[in-house]
Amino acid sequence: MFGIGAGVSFFVNYSHKNLPVQSSPAISTPVPAGTEYASVRELAEQMSRPGGFTSEGLVTYLQERIRTLDPQLRSVIELNPQALETARALDQERANGQVRGPLHGIPILLKDTIETQGMQTSAGAFALVGAPAGKNAPLVDYLISQGAIVLAKTNMTELAGFRGTPDGWSSRGGQTRNPHHPDADVGGSSSGSAAAVAAGLAPLAVGAETNGSIIVPAALNGVVGLKPSVGLLDRDGIIPASQHQDTPGPMARSVFDVALMLNAMSARKSHDSASVEVDYTKLLVPDALKGKRIGYPVTFTANGEVQALENSAQFSKTLEVLEAQGAVLVPINLRIADASGYEKLLLSDVKEELNGYLAKRTGLPVKSLTELIKFNEDRDGKDTDHQPDLKKINDSTLDPASRETAWNELIQDFRSTVDEPIKTHTLDAIVSDFDTNSYFGVAVAGYPGITVPSGTTEDGLPTAAHFFGTRLSEPTLLAVAHGYEQAAQAATKPEL
């Protein structure tokens, strides 16, 4: 049930062998080999210069790469049939002297929780297939208004991991594989977004996170992933899990490209947004680390007891790079907040929000969590239980008023675990080894974090550093992460 391609034949229009082959007019300049790993700026320069390749050519090149490589990776769940037509129109705009912005003509990928007009939005679940979105999520419109091209939707851990299945597996898309090694952990739930960017199937992707769903797969697949402050970006039109933690976020192969994408994603405000007018690329300067006070945990306190934290040899190298670039390193203690009530609160949120979303979404075969569970039972068979977490969610009961009070108390406690050392030591940011699971507390707090490649393990798999800070500290985090990335030069490409 959990093997590659499981269930794909059920809906053959979205299996790889049936992805639409779109006709393309002759392209004057072929897209050269290696372009799949070019930065956004490099792609834009090529498309802007006389004799350079076109956006249409780039889309065609990446579509062919998807058809060649993705049957093994299972990172893409559906190609956008309008991508080439959109590329042609944007090429014409460029020829007429109209360039919408840095993302003009740049292909992007969207996680399959993000509503995209004319395409399925299923969170990887067959139960949510059959009614293409009638309009874009506002976030998608923001990106399109900046000239981005939706190339495809990406596979993911089904229902953002709340079905209880392995990371990267969905009934609709099969098992996403880590491009660095097919048996390595791919992470979740934005598995396909991270794997596809790492494999050079697109330069940019949008993931979404409740807890770890951007940070974890980005780290494990060796790309940059930013989990923004909750409320910074518009969440309308994205299949929800928890209003207290949900946020979309950009994924790319460099911090600069993540910053470019964040600019486009926060281009407009909504009732949900806490955004401020800022160009996130302006602070990405060569000496960004000089004088920055960066805390790193050497101890942690749990249940009132202080314990030593053993950092990896790779993390020690990360600290050496930061110090060599002029950062002031400050050893700190991190308090571990009490998370004993977290699961009950989260599952109650998921039940309320998923039921609300399904009830409003038109044309789906299921209209509630109960119907979704029944759909899966009828399809998979009652004797094979592949949805233990869904049943647990559906059985959860919490009074809404007491739940909100408990959430507020929990969030404040988790925020203080980050705020206290930053205030005490006058820190600009905190850095930790990704393996310390620091992303969990950052997610509960609703605070931002960014993961950056830091090297490889003895087995050649990516390692990562995790930078995080207080609410709306994205400009500082991006600057620090960029400075580290440029000095470390630790990103690696998979051998495909």
Please report, for each region that a protein language model flagged, where it lies by residue.
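An N-terminal boundary/leader segment
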Residues: 1-86, 317-320, 324-327, 374, ...
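Glycine-rich, small-residue loops and helix-cap segments
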Residues: 105, 145, 149, 202, ...
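Acidic-enriched catalytic cores of C-N bond-cleaving enzymes acting on peptides and small amides
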Residues: 253-278, 303-337, 355-375
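Sec-exported extracytoplasmic/periplasmic mature domains
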Residues: 45-52, 63-71, 81-84, 88-96, ...
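Gly/Ser-rich catalytic/binding loops embedded in alpha/beta enzyme cores
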Residues: 31-211, 229
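Flexible glycine/proline-enriched surface loops and loop-helix/loop-strand junctions
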Residues: 43, 123-125, 177-182, 189, ...
